[in-house]
């Protein structure tokens, strides 16, 4: 336990918060072939592999994911939300931050209804997150 005098001389430092999705905070200058500090809310990428993964211990399912090479040349695993999808290799997708708690190594989500990703068919509630248009009736 430090004394008051020690704290006056050298105050406590607050910890710097690390990003939950660090790959979105890096750009790539292809002309200079170097990374830049470029924060972005989403990034475009190309699917290199689409598959399923089993979740951690108490849960059981086949969760859909895609391995995506982003525009800054970094590869990440991204979760495909919703029921059914049209993604395959070489599909162009939009990736946002947000981890999936029971899938190890998946820290990103694919945005449904953007670029090559279709929205979820037959979805009536919570359509905004799944890229579904308003039904005509």
Curated annotation (Swiss-Prot):
GO biological process: translation
Domain of life: Bacteria
UniProt entry keywords in alphabetical sequence: Methylation, Ribonucleoprotein, Ribosomal protein, RNA-binding, rRNA-binding, tRNA-binding
GO cellular component, one term: small ribosomal subunit
InterPro entries, per database record: NA-bd_OB-fold (IPR012340), Ribosomal_uS12 (IPR006032), Ribosomal_uS12_bac (IPR005679)
Family annotation (Pfam families): Ribosom_S12_S23 (PF00164)
An annotated Gene Ontology molecular function: tRNA binding
Keyword Secreted tagged: no
Signal peptide: none
Modified residues (3-methylthioaspartic acid): 102
Disulfide bonds listed in the record: none
Region Disordered, annotated ranges: 1-57, 118-137
Repressor among keywords: no
PANTHER family assigned to the protein according to its UniProt record, in alphabetical order: 30S RIBOSOMAL PROTEIN S12 FAMILY MEMBER
Oligomeric form and interacting partners: Part of the 30S ribosomal subunit. Contacts proteins S8 and S17. May interact with IF1 in the 30S initiation complex.
Family note: Belongs to the universal ribosomal protein uS12 family.
Function: With S4 and S5 plays an important role in translational accuracy.
HAMAP family from the UniProt entry: Ribosomal_uS12_B (MF_00403_B)
Protein name: Small ribosomal subunit protein uS12
Species classification: Bacteria, Bacillati, Bacillota, Bacilli, Bacillales
């Amino acid at each position: 336990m430090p004394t008051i005098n020690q704290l006056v001389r050298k105050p406590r430092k607050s910890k710097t918060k690390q990003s939950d999705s660090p790959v979105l905070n890096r750009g790539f200058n292809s002309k200079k072939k170097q990374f830049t500090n470029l924060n972005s809310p989403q990034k475009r990428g190309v699917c290199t592999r689409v598959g399923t993964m089993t979740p951690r211990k108490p849960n059981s399912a086949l969760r859909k994911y895609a391995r995506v090479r982003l525009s800054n040349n970094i590869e990440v695993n991204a979760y495909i939300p919703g029921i059914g999808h049209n993604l395959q290799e070489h599909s162009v997708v939009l990736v946002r931050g947000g981890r999936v708690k029971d899938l190890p190594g998946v820290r990103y989500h694919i945005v449904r209804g953007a670029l090559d990703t279709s929205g979820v068919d037959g979805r009536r509630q919570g359509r905004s997150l799944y890229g579904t248009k308003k039904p005509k009736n």
